[in-house]
Swiss-Prot record:
It is found in: Plastid, Chloroplast thylakoid membrane. GO terms for cellular component: chloroplast thylakoid membrane; photosystem II reaction center. PSII is composed of 1 copy each of membrane proteins PsbA, PsbB, PsbC, PsbD, PsbE, PsbF, PsbH, PsbI, PsbJ, PsbK, PsbL, PsbM, PsbT, PsbX, PsbY, PsbZ, Psb30/Ycf12, at least 3 peripheral proteins of the oxygen-evolving complex and a large number of cofactors. It forms dimeric complexes. One of the components of the core complex of photosystem II (PSII). PSII is a light-driven water:plastoquinone oxidoreductase that uses light energy to abstract electrons from H(2)O, generating O(2) and a proton gradient subsequently used for ATP formation. It consists of a core antenna complex that captures photons, and an electron transfer chain that converts photonic excitation into a charge separation. It comes from Pisum sativum (Garden pea). Residues 1-24 form a propeptide. The chain crosses the membrane at residues 4-24. This is Photosystem II reaction center protein K. The gene is psbK.
Length: 46
């Protein structure tokens, strides 16, 4: 069960990184996604 949860978190994490990469040229969108992108890599390590 923990492995499935970790896999889902990694998928969400990669999706957020790709979306933040495309939205990086928009300062407002990047400022909105920045706290989420900073927090998400911690979740699979828990």
């Amino acid at each position: 069960m923990l492995n499935i949860f970790s896999l889902v978190c990694i998928c969400i994490n990669s999706a957020l990184y790709s979306s933040s990469f495309f939205l990086g040229k928009l300062p407002e969108a990047y400022a909105f996604l920045n706290p989420i992108v900073d927090f998400m890599p911690v979740i699979p390590l828990l």
